[in-house]
């Protein structure tokens, strides 16, 4: 059995809002595995975050973040249960942190995997099943390998499964769970939009080095223009 430290217990408590002794027991029962311990607490009905997950979230906040230089912009809506929490500084900070997270994740397109269109999922699965690396393997092994790769691909597209930029040891989903436990209300990231300056516009490709060289190249010396010959009329002598 893995040794359970006070840090492990505190981490689980922050994620779930369960009691210290319940968290310790959950970790002991699951050999120190945090994810299994969370599932254990939910099954036992001891996770506060799990208890709140079904409650209606009709309040919240729409916030924005513009990255330095104005190259990237984000709009995000995060919902909670009451306007009291929506006005809370901790909630406002959470929403702003999520907006910054979105700005830092160019590949993220969805909040969670249940938003991904089924036709996209099927297409990705078909491509993976046709891989040369799987030729000759039994169907059940193929299915297991493909499902693992597919899950990884889909999670890479979803905000909640990204490592949190301020603490890579947790995901955005876990950050949200911590906030739920701390503020005592259910919360959800409802939707977001990420803007990138010039995205979708066809730009004329140019070689910067060549442009600079052309601008700094000394101009060829101009030859002085040839002087036009002028004929002078000889003045006749007066008689």
Curated annotation (Swiss-Prot):
CDD domains: UBA_EF-Ts. Keywords: Cytoplasm, Elongation factor, Protein biosynthesis. Residues 82-85 are annotated as: Involved in Mg(2+) ion dislocation from EF-Tu. GO terms for molecular function: translation elongation factor activity. It comes from the Bacteria. Residues 229-239 have a biased composition (Basic residues). InterPro entries: EF-Ts_dimer_sf, Transl_elong_EFTs/EF1B, Transl_elong_EFTs/EF1B_dimer, Transl_elong_Ts_CS, UBA-like_sf. GO terms for cellular component: cytoplasm. It is found in: Cytoplasm. Residues 213-239 are annotated as: Disordered. SUPFAM superfamilies: Elongation factor Ts (EF-Ts), dimerisation domain (SSF54713), UBA-like (SSF46934). Its main location: cytoplasm. Associates with the EF-Tu.GDP complex and induces the exchange of GDP to GTP. It remains bound to the aminoacyl-tRNA.EF-Tu.GTP complex up to the GTP hydrolysis stage on the ribosome. Belongs to the EF-Ts family. This is Elongation factor Ts. It comes from Acaryochloris marina (strain MBIC 11017). The lineage of its organism: Bacteria, Bacillati, Cyanobacteriota, Cyanophyceae, Acaryochloridales.
